[in-house]
């Protein structure tokens, strides 16, 4: 019986979606613009990386050709040097969003059909009733922020006041999120999580996709820094995801990274949540090596997005892509005959773009495994085609959305 590994390179988009203009993202292209910046010398950082973007293993799987399908051009340095060794294509999202839950749920076969609730870019950003309910139920002296903000910028601006007053920092973005930042020691990590659980309930009537705990440490004198103890409190997806199908069939499932949070811990099997892309990939490979027949490992690599995309850090993003590329041989080595690996993304986050938000982009679809004949998949009209294809590969009943490419 076959096994499958699905890897989401968080935010690694490959060109603006057909409707990107509706989001202010027409012309965005995460991978393409990083490659162009590196080719022009704008991706260099002493001690980190230099020169053109070097992704020989991803190029051999068809990444450059997937980019060409999405934008009409192969990014600098991403043309394959020999025959492509995977099925390759690009996918567009049917859900009206460019957020993590929408992307992942659609990949898993359940596109979001109703619009998420969003908070206006005003100050205050949150309805007074929401804030009052959170303050009362969580026993808070008040909140700070109450605005759209970059997470790293707002803790630098308000971290000292937060420590002094005990008021958590609450902020949002263009995504459907309510984020709460608090000092792990001064406020307490478990107290932050409990505050977020309350906020999750308070935000439900507003159809907010995620409440996110953003713990940090440090001081005004030495600077504040986020820790690895982020936790997402998501709305549960509609029934019928690939994960639900696997659970019903009694299959082994391992969720690595923030997959458990994204799917509200429903049908996510054994959850492993290390810190950082490298540790997450280590955990996924270890889990896959011992995975029984018919099993599934679902991996999210979030550092592309959080550490580099939102921070508009081209050299850092390029280095992260190159680090993943170097480890592709390890991924290929754990695949046995009959196994399938799919590499994709959930949205874009072009580090050359304006602002600090996600970008509405198409995503790569790279599928490979021993014995799989390489071919072009073309444009997939929904991210759900990936979930449908994995389900078919694993011998599960068809999902409610998506067309398998088999």
Curated annotation (Swiss-Prot):
Its cofactor is Mn(2+). The keyword Secreted does not apply. Its EC number is 5.4.2.7. It is found in: Cytoplasm. GO terms for biological process: 2-deoxyribose 1-phosphate catabolic process; 5-phosphoribose 1-diphosphate biosynthetic process; metabolic compound salvage; nucleotide metabolic process. InterPro entries: Alkaline_phosphatase_core_sf, DeoB, Metalloenzyme, Phosphopentomutase_DeoB_cap_sf. Keywords: Cytoplasm, Isomerase, Manganese, Metal-binding. It catalyses: 2-deoxy-alpha-D-ribose 1-phosphate = 2-deoxy-D-ribose 5-phosphate; alpha-D-ribose 1-phosphate = D-ribose 5-phosphate. Pathway: Carbohydrate degradation; 2-deoxy-D-ribose 1-phosphate degradation; D-glyceraldehyde 3-phosphate and acetaldehyde from 2-deoxy-alpha-D-ribose 1-phosphate: step 1/2. GO terms for cellular component: cytosol. Its main location: cytoplasm. Mn(2+) 1 binds at residues 10, 346-347. GO terms for molecular function: magnesium ion binding; manganese ion binding; phosphopentomutase activity. Binds 2 manganese ions. Mn(2+) 2 binds at residues 305, 310, 358. It is an enzyme of class 5 (isomerase). Belongs to the phosphopentomutase family. Isomerase that catalyzes the conversion of deoxy-ribose 1-phosphate (dRib-1-P) and ribose 1-phosphate (Rib-1-P) to deoxy-ribose 5-phosphate (dRib-5-P) and ribose 5-phosphate (Rib-5-P), respectively. This is Phosphopentomutase. It comes from Methylorubrum extorquens (strain PA1). The lineage of its organism: Bacteria, Pseudomonadati, Pseudomonadota, Alphaproteobacteria, Hyphomicrobiales. The gene is deoB.
């Amino acid at each position: 019986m076959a096994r499958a590994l699905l890897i989401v390179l968080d935010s690694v988009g490959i060109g603006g979606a057909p409707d990107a203009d509706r989001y202010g993202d027409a012309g965005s292209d995460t991978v393409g613009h990083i490659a162009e910046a590196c080719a022009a010398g704008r991706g260099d950082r002493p001690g980190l990386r230099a020169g053109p973007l070097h992704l020989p293993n991803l190029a051999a799987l068809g990444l450059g050709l997937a980019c060409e399908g999405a934008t009409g051009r192969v990014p600098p340095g991403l043309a394959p040097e020999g025959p492509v060794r995977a099925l390759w294509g690009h996918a567009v999202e049917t859900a009206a969003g460019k957020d993590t839950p929408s992307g992942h749920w659609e990949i898993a076969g359940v596109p979001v059909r109703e619009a998420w609730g969003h908070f206006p870019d005003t100050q205050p950003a949150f309805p007074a009733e929401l804030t009052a309910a959170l303050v009362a139920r969580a026993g808070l002296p008040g909140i700070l922020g109450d605005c759209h903000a970059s997470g790293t910028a707002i803790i630098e601006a308000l971290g000292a006041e937060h420590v002094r007053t005990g008021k958590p920092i609450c902020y949002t973005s263009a995504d459907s999120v309510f984020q709460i930042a608090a000092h792990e020691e001064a406020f307490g990590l478990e107290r932050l999580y409990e505050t977020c659980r309350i906020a999750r309930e308070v935000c439900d009537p507003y159809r907010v996709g995620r409440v996110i705990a953003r713990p940090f440490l440090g001081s005004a004198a030495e600077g504040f820094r986020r820790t690895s103890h982020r936790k997402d409190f998501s709305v549960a997806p509609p029934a019928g995801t690939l994960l639900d199908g696997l659970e019903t069939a009694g299959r082994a499932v391992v969720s690595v990274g923030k997959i458990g949070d994204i799917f509200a811990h429903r049908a996510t099997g054994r959850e492993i949540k290390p810190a950082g892309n490298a540790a997450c990939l280590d955990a996924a490979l270890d889990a896959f090596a011992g995975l029984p027949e018919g099993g599934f490992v679902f991996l999210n690599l979030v550092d592309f997005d959080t550490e580099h995309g939102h921070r508009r850090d081209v050299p850092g993003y390029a280095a992260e892509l190159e680090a993943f590329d170097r480890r592709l041989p390890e991924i290929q080595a754990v695949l046995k005959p009959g196994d399938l690996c799919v590499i994709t993304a959930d949205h874009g986050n072009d580090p050359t773009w304006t602002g600090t938000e996600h970008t509405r982009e198409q995503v790569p679809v790279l599928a490979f495994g021993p014995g799989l004949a390489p071919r072009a998949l073309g444009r997939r009209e929904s991210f759900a085609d990936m979930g449908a294809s994995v389900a078919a590969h694993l011998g599960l009943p068809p999902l409610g959305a998506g067309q398998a490419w088999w």
